[in-house]
Design a protein with these regions (language model features):
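Membrane-interface helix-loop-helix junctions at boundaries between adjacent transmembrane segments
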Residues: 46-134, 288-293, 297-299
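Internal helix-turn-beta structural module
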Residues: 276-316
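Membrane-embedded hairpin module used as a gating/binding unit in multi-pass transport
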Residues: 119-213
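Hydrophobic cores of alpha-helical transmembrane segments in multi-pass inner/ER membrane proteins
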Residues: 101-110, 138-146, 260, 303-315
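Juxtamembrane helix-loop boundaries in multi-pass membrane proteins
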Residues: 32-37, 91-101, 170-185, 294-303
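Early transmembrane hairpin of solute transport permeases
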Residues: 1-84, 197-282, 287
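Membrane-interface capping segments at transmembrane-helix boundaries
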Residues: 149-160, 314-329
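Short, highly charged, low-complexity non-transmembrane loops/tails of multi-pass membrane proteins
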Residues: 98, 128-129, 162-168, 321-331
Length: 331
């Protein structure tokens, strides 16, 4: 929520989706806390609400009614769909709701297009802020590191090493398993690494890239650490040497940051597979967005889900074949 408030989300376009999730929880007589995280991630579809409000051919009250109705429906269908698609990639894509949001966005945008309503994307990309924002971010990360050692004491290093040993598959909770101090340290290290990586490849620090960096920081409490995000990011970087785009361009630099949704693949299967996942993700992420015209802010969550569903069964089949071969059992 915080990161994407820098590009795409605001106080007006998120509430209908959140209310839809609340209605779903109330309908099933479940506590809202069970679905609140889906509601937060589901606000990735908030541009749809804004887009409907800008259909100038319709009266204002009708636009307001339609946007609220669509937002409520999106929020209502998100929980069951997100639960269902999780079984497809088995937690190897951390942005699970981004995958389900991509499916919903595809359906909604297709319906809008069938009524002659089209969406036009535009690029607003700020430049020249690197020195100021880098200084601010460095101060933040240094403060987090100091706070981690100040409140965590000598055990921070041990707990952090335990984090580094985790694969990071969806559902991991570093705060619960390793404590707040080690988690804050992990967040600071990942944030600093991502920031330096962006600047190192010639990228710009602005709203979208800060959103990507803060997303990495946020998910450093649940799945990401430097050992499993680095291979994915380097995979995207290596892809830029062979493909027809430059890594510092807006879409590729965002794909670089958000590709870390596939961190569990590198954490579970190793560096080489992580590099391959990043390589594939860069291609998928830069091409699937055309389906829903940018209406899903978590485009890389959708792309990451596709890559995970493609790669994980193949990797498991190879592993099973090797295991059977060692046991002298044929497939």
């Amino acid at each position: 929520m915080f990161g994407f408030s820098l590009f795409g989300k605001n106080l007006l376009n998120i509430w209908a989706i959140l209310l839809g999730v609340y209605i779903y929880a109330h309908y099933h007589k479940m506590h809202l806390s069970r679905y609140v995280y889906i509601g937060f991630y589901g606000t990735s579809l908030s541009p749809i609400i804004t887009q409907i409000m800008y259909i100038t051919d319709l009266p204002y009250l009708l636009r307001l009614f339609i946007s609220l109705a669509v937002g409520l429906m999106i929020g209502f269908v998100l929980p069951p769909l997100s639960t269902h698609v999780h079984y497809a990639h088995k937690g190897y894509s951390l942005y699970n709701v981004g995958f389900s949001a991509g499916i919903i966005a595809t359906v909604v945008v297709s319906v809008l297009k069938s009524f002659g309503i089209t969406t036009e994307s535009r690029l607003i990309w700020s430049e020249g802020n690197n020195q100021l924002l880098f200084a601010v971010l460095c101060c933040l990360f240094v403060a987090m590191i100091i706070a981690a050692f100040l409140f965590g004491g000598k055990e921070v290093g041990t707990s952090y090493r335990k984090i580094l040993s985790c694969s990071g598959i969806g559902g991991t909770d570093y705060l619960r398993d390793n404590g707040g101090a080690a988690t804050v340290l992990n967040m600071a290290i990942n944030g600093l690494f991502a920031t330096i990586f962006v600047l190192g490849v010639g990228g710009e620090l602005n709203g979208p890239t800060l959103g990507g960096i803060f997303t990495i920081i946020g998910f450093s409490a649940t799945g990401k650490h430097i050992r499993n995000i680095a291979p994915i990011m380097f995979g995207v970087l290596f892809a830029s040497f062979t493909k027809h785009w430059t890594i510092s361009s807006p879409s590729p630099i965002l794909a670089l940051l958000f590709s870390t949704t596939l961190a569990p693949i590198a954490g579970e299967f190793g560096i080489f597979v992580g590099l391959l996942a990043g390589f594939l993700h860069s291609s998928v992420a830069l091409n699937v967005g055309i389906v829903y015209g940018g209406m899903n802010l978590y485009n890389n969550g959708f792309a990451g889900g596709i890559v995970a569903i493609f790669m994980v069964p193949v990797i498991h089949s190879i592993r099973d074949r090797r295991a059977r071969a060692k046991g002298e059992i044929s497939l």
